[in-house]
Swiss-Prot record:
UniProt-listed SMART domains: Skp1
Gene3D superfamilies in UniProt: Potassium Channel Kv1.1, Chain A
One BP term from GO: protein ubiquitination
Family membership noted in the UniProt record: Belongs to the SKP1 family.
Pathway: Protein modification; protein ubiquitination
Descriptive protein name: E3 ubiquitin ligase complex SCF subunit sconC
Alphabetized PANTHER family for the sequence: SKP1
Region (Interaction with the F-box domain of F-box proteins): 106-164
Coiled coil: none
CDD domains per UniProt: BTB_POZ_SKP1 (cd18322)
Keyword Lipid metabolism tagged: no
Gene designation: sconC
Organism: Arthroderma benhamiae (strain ATCC MYA-4681 / CBS 112371) (Trichophyton mentagrophytes)
Reported function: Essential component of the SCF (SKP1-CUL1-F-box protein) E3 ubiquitin ligase complexes, which mediate the ubiquitination and subsequent proteasomal degradation of target proteins. Controls sulfur metabolite repression, probably by mediating the inactivation or degradation of the metR transcription factor.
Amino acid sequence: MASTATNKITLTSSDGVEVTIERQVAERSILIKNMLEDLGDSGEPIPIPNVNESVLKKVIEWCEHHKGDPPSTGDDDVDSRRKTTDIDEWDQKFMQVDQEMLFEIILAANYLDIKALLDVGCKTVANMIKGKSPEEIRKTFNIQNDFTPEEEDQIRRENEWAEE
């Protein structure tokens, strides 16, 4: 429920749990911000059908910490984001979760359109992969190798440039 006095809104997770938060925190999500603009101050809880309670609370924790950050403009320096996998200390600690939760946070950030959180999640995964062999990456993410030795050799030959 939205209240002009406290400026709070309620979100309903996929498992039916209602979470009340500040509107400013919720608006870190472009999806929620657009829904609020479209629906107005109806006072009705906003359903978040693709995100369960535990993930929603984790995303809200991140949004609360970053509520004072300037909003993403969409035309931020894309090149600088692509070139670095540096993550600030608070975000590194925040992302110290099990793999399932990490991937759920990434999916939720994508669904809720929280670009900065999506970037942090993807950089976390990139850092998990950095410097590892394909075998080590498979072990880290529990991925089964379904290539034949011949297919692996062909892929290595085609991608030799990446090994340099």
